[in-house]
């Protein structure tokens, strides 16, 4: 999977956090059998930027931890021959994570910043791949898978 990583944190994002992001998303993609030609972007921001996004796209005027922007399937692609569709990149969408919230929530929840970052990465990635937690059965399925992936990364609770 191709990952486009952007850092808008004014130096707050650590190289170890970038490596964790790449590893966590690669492991989650492997677990979900995401095609190799899949593409997504991950942008790390500070609270003011994610607050603006949250306000503009969700109508909630406060900072949040992660926002996922899934790319919907294009019905026009369904009309293409299967051989051509197989060659096209699969665009999953975009994740935006507040590095400020990673730190704040790790302190509040009394676990490591790596655990919090891993959680937000995997949680957002699952949303990009169609998982949600609106219904109890869906929540159980998503959260179980999420914890299995985090356990595989050594980021157990």
Curated annotation (Swiss-Prot):
Entry keyword Cell division: no
Keywords carried by this UniProt record: Cytoplasm, Endonuclease, Hydrolase, Metal-binding, Nuclease, Ribosome biogenesis, rRNA processing, Zinc
Residues bound to Zn(2+): 123, 127, 133
Protein name, UniProt field: Endoribonuclease YbeY
Gene this protein is translated from: ybeY
Pfam families: YbeY
Cofactors: Zn(2+)
Record's subcellular location: Cytoplasm
Free-text comment on the cofactor: Binds 1 zinc ion.
Family statement: Belongs to the endoribonuclease YbeY family.
